[in-house]
Curated annotation (Swiss-Prot):
Catalytic function, reaction form: RNA(n) + a ribonucleoside 5'-triphosphate = RNA(n+1) + diphosphate
Protein name, per record: DNA-directed RNA polymerase subunit beta
Keyword check for Protein biosynthesis: no
Enzyme Commission code: 2.7.7.6
Species name: Lactobacillus delbrueckii subsp. bulgaricus (strain ATCC 11842 / DSM 20081 / BCRC 10696 / JCM 1002 / NBRC 13953 / NCIMB 11778 / NCTC 12712 / WDCM 00102 / Lb 14)
Keywords noted in UniProt: DNA-directed RNA polymerase, Nucleotidyltransferase, Transcription, Transferase
Stated role: DNA-dependent RNA polymerase catalyzes the transcription of DNA into RNA using the four ribonucleoside triphosphates as substrates.
Amino acid sequence: MLNGHVVNYGQHRTRRSFSRIKEILPLPNLTDVQTESYKWFLDEGVKEVFDDILPISDTSGRLTLEYVDYKLQEPKYTVDESRKHDATYSAPMHVTLKLTNHETGEIKTQDVFFGDLPLMTKSGSFIVNGAERVIVSQLVRSPGVYYSGEFDKNGRQIFGTTVIPNRGAWLEFETDAKNISYVRVDRTRKLPLSVLVRALGFGSDSEIKEIFGDSDTLDLTLDKDVHKNPADSRVAEALKDIYDRLRPGEPKTTDSSRSLLVSRFFDPRRYDLAAVGRYKVNKKLSLKNRLLGYTLAETLADPGTGEVLAAKGTVVNNEVMDVLKDYLDRDDFKTVTYTPSDEGVIPEPVTVQEIKVFSREIPDREIKLISNGHIAEDVKCITPADIIASVNYFLELQEGVGNIDDIDHLGNRRIRRVGELLQNQMRIGLARMERVVRERMSIQDAATVTPQQLINIRPIVGSIKEFFGSSQLSQFMDQNNPLGELTHKRRMSALGPGGLSRDRAGYEVRDVHYTHYGRLCPIETPEGPNIGLINSMATYAIINKYGFLETPYRRVSWATHKVTDKIDYLTADEEDNYIIAGANTPLNEDGSFVDDVILCRHREDNVEVSPDRIDYIDVIPKQVVSVTSACIPFLENDDSNRALMGANHQRQAVPLINPHGPLVATGMEYRAGHDSGDALLAEADGEVEYVDANEIRVRREDQTLDTYTLEKYRRSNATKNYNQTPNVKRGDKVVDGQVIANGPSMADGELALGQNPVIAFTTWNMYNFEDAIMLSERLVKEDVYTSIHIEDYDSEARDTKLGPEEITREIPNVGEDALKDLDENGIIRIGAEVHDGDILVGKVTPKGITELSAEERLLHAIFGEKAREVRDTSLRVPHGGGGVVQDVQVFTREAGDELAPGVNTLVRVYIVQKRKIQVGDKMSGRHGNKGTVALIAPVEDMPYLPDGTPVDICLNPMGVPSRMNIGQLLEIHLGRAARALGIHVATPVFDGASEDDVWDFVREAGVDSDGKTVLYDGRTGEPFHNRVSVGVMYYLKLTHMVDDKIHARSIGPYSLVTQQPLGGKAQFGGQRFGEMEVWALEAYGAAYTLQEILTYKSDDVVGRVKAYEAIVKGERITKPGVPESFRVLVKELQSLGLDLRVLDSDENEVELRDMDEDSNEHVNIDALSRLAEAQEKKKLAEEEAEIAAEAEAEGSAEGDAAEADADANEAETADDDKASK
C-alpha cells in the first residue's frame, strides 16, 4: 500500500498527496485583491469623492452645483481591440449634475462627460495605450494615534505620542529629561501639554487634575505652565500661546486664535482622519484593549439592572472581557461628562468613559483609564474627547500602563489598494476642478449658465492619465508566465507616493516581522535594493474594509478546549491578544489536543502552554507563505535565502512549447493556473459540442450555446508566446469555473513551468564546475526546452516639413535581392524568413537641399533629379532579431484607425523566433539551484543507468552542501520513485512527505533504498567509482537567454562629445576598456596595444579614419593622432578660465588641429571620398547620353553607385546618418 491519499486537482490531474491536515477552508480567489477593490471603487468610491467635493457654491451663495449620479457607458474598444490599436481599455464616464440658482429658484440638471475611466479586465489588470499594466497595492503607515518610548543617555525612558491624520496637522506629545510633558501643534515649537487642555476650555489646574487624576508628570507640567498675563483668562492665554506658535509675529486675539485652532483640527475640509483613522483612534484609546491584564479598582455593574459584571479586584482576562465588551460599546456605561468654559475651542460638553484599575508596580495605587467614549465612524475630525483620552494614555504610559507602538507592526501599516489609489487620484483632479468651477460661477451669467459650462474636465482626465501612465505604483505587467502575472497582482510595495524611499529605508522596516505570519510571505521578496520593501501577500490573507491584512484561524472552544471548524479572520493587533497553536499540532479525532504541553505563538514569543490556554489554531501550514513559495516542494528543507531565489526563479521561467506538470508538486499549481487569468474557464455547466485550436463551443443545460475563442500566438508583455490550447474534447461534461483551455506554461489545467528530466548529481570532466550545467543533446533534439518568442517592430510614415514619408518598394540604392520578400507596397510578406539587417518595411523620407558630397554629385549626374529627393529610412531587422514573420498589421487614417498626431500610416511587423536550449542559457530548479548551460553532450556520451537510460542533466554535487537547499535531494528521490510507479505526487509545504515517507515511497517503488545507483560512463562503458544520486527533478529554463545577451560591435555609433563608442547592446556599443584594464596593460608593458586601444579603437577621430583607409588599401597604418578626449579636457580647463596651450619640444605653441594634418592631404577627406571623386571625373569625361543608355540597358551603374554609397556610409563614422542609425 502506497503512502498518502489520492487528490484530484481539477478534472484532469490526480496526485497522491502526503498531506495530513484536512483543508477545511478553501483558498480565496487569488486575484480578488485587485478585482474586489476596483468593484468597490465603481460602486462606492466614485460617489464618495463627488460627495466630498460637491456641492460647490460661489462666494455670494447665488449658485450651487450638486452631484446626483454617475454612469459608465459601453467601452469604445474590447480588450483585444485595445491591445491591437494601442488604445486604453476604458469607458466614457457621464456625471449627472444639478445646478440650483437660489435667486430665481431655477434648477438645471444635466449629464456632463467627465472623460474616460480605465476599466479593469476580468483578470485584474488594465490596458493602457495597448500595454497591460498592474496597479500594485501600497503598504503605508495607517492614520491613528501612536505611542513611542526611547531611552535617553541616563537610561530613563522618554515617551512620545503622535496623532497622525490622513490629511491635516499633526499633534505630538513628548516628555523631556525633567519629566515635564510638552505638546507640538503641526510640527511647531513645543508648549507645556497643559496649554492644549486649557485651550479646550478646562482652564484651572483643579479642572485638569479632576479629569486626569494625580500624576507626578502632570504636577511638574502644571508648575511649568505659569499664568503670564493676568488680564487674560487661562483659556484665552492658552489659545493665544498656540496661535503664537502657529503664526509667530502676527497680532492675535482670543477669537482669531480660537478660529485658527478650529480650522486646523475641527474643520472636515482641512482635517481628515478617514474611516481607518477613526477606527484606529477608537481602537487604541478603547478600554477593551487597555483593561486586559489589569485588576479592577471598582466594581462594574449593568447600568440598567445593577447586575454585577465584574467585582473589584477581578483580573480582566479574555473571558471577563467577553462579558464586558458589549457594555464598553454603550453610551451609558461608566461615562463622565466634563463641561468646558465658553471661551474654549468647542464649548460643548465632553463625554468620556472612565474605569479605575490598580497599578502593577504599586499594587494599592489607583489609576484612572479614560477612553474617548463611543465616537461614530463617520466623525472624521479629531474631537476634544480624543485629545483628553490620548493625553490620559500618554500620562499613564509613564506609570507603566499601556503599550508603546511598533511602527513595523502590521496593525499599524495598512494596504492602499487600486480602488483607494484611484479614488485619491480622482480627488486631486476634482479639487483642482473645484477652483475652476468657483471662478466660472462668479464670471458667468447666473441666468443662462449650465453645469456643462462650469465644468472643466481637463484636471480630472489629466490626474487619472498621470496615475496610470507615470505613477510608481502603475507597473508594466510581468507576463513571463502565469505565476509572474499572479504574483505581480498580489504584490505589496512600501515604495511610492506617501510611502518610503529605498534610500531612507533602514533594516527594521525591511526585516520580517512576527505580524507577517499568515499575512505577508517571509520568503518572497526581490534580491537587491528593494529587499523587504516589496512583499507578496500570503495565500490565505485577505484585506478588510480598513485596509488591514487579516489571516484565518480555527477557534478553540473556551468551554471544551477542543478545536472547532469555526473560522475567524484576525488582524495583526487582534492576534496580539491570543495564544495560537500551529496547524501541525497533533489532534485527536474529536478535536482535542493530544499533548499536555503545546508550543504556541504569542506576539513575538514561542510559549509552551497547556491546552486550556489556547485560543486559536492555524488553519493550514501553507497560510504562512505566498503562492510562489507554496509551489516549492520540501520548502521546509531549504535554507531561506535559496528558497527566496527559488520563488523568484519560478516567475522567470519561460513558457515552453510542450510543458509538463511537475511529477513532484505541492498541490498549489492548480489554483495558481486557475486564478492567474491565463486559463480559459467555463462560465456555466454544460457539454462540449465542438473543439478546435481556435474555438470551443459548450451547450449549456438550458440549451444556450457558449462560444469561447482561444488566444493564439499573441505576443505577451515579456515578448513571450501567449498561446492557449484546448483542455477538453467533444462530449466532455464541464462545470462552471472549470479550466477548458490551458494558457502558456500550463498542462492539464495546472501550472507547468518546466520539465521533468532525469538528473544525476555527478561531475563530468569539470564541465559542471561552479554551477555550470551539462545537458544531453536529447533535450535539444526533442524540443524539451524549446520556447517561442515574438517581437514586434513598428514603422511610422509621418508628415515632415519637406513632405510626407512614403511606404514603398522603390527604395534608393537597394538591390532587387533585398526586396524579394516585400509586396507591391514595400511591406514584408507573412511567413518570410528574415535575418539581421533585412528590410521589413520599405520607407523613404524627403531630403532637404544640402551641400552635396562627391558621391552624391556623381549619382545626381547619372540619375538626374530623382536621386536627390529621398533617403532610405526603411525598417530593418535589428541585430539578433531574425526569425519568421508571423503577422503584419497596417493602420491608416483612411481606414479610420486612431493614430498619433502627424502619423499617416503605421505598419507593425511581428517576428517569431523558435529558441532551443543552448550553451549560455540560464536554468534553475525550484530550490534556488541555478546554473548556466556549459556543455550539450551527445546522448551516447552521457552517463547512463544500469537499465540503459541516459541521464538528461548532470549537476555538480558541490552545489548542495554549502547552499543548504536539501529539498532538491528529497525531490529527486521522490521524483524517481514517482516515475517508476507512473504517478504524480503532491507534497504541500510544511505538511508534505517527511524523510521517512520519502524512503518508504522509494522502497515501495522498488528503487535502490539509498536513492543512489551505479552510473556508467557513456564514452567508455565503465561504471563510475561511487554510486551516484540520480532521480527526477523539475527543472526550468529561465528568461535570461544567451541570445538576448550576446553582443559584438563592428562599426557603430560614437558619442557626440567624447567621440568614443557608445556602450550597451541597445546602442550597438563597444566594451568599455576602463581604468583597471589600462593598469593591466601597463603592468605587462604592452605599450603599442595600449596606444591603439586609447586612440584608433576609441576616440582618435582622424586616426581611425586613416586606419580604415590603410586597411582597405592594404597599406601600413599611420601613427595615431590626438584623442578627442584630450581636446575635450583642454576645452574644459579653458572654460574654467585656465590658459592652457600645447607646446612642442622647442616650446613653440602648436594648434591641436595642425597635429592631425598630413603634408599633402586634408584630414576630412578619407579614402572612399577620393575614390568617388576620381570616379566622378572619369564618368563626366564620357557622354551623358551614352551613360544613361548603359544604365538603362544593364543597370550595372546603379549597382556600382550603390556599392560606392554603401562603402562611403560605412566610413563616415561621425556623420549624421551614422548617428541616426
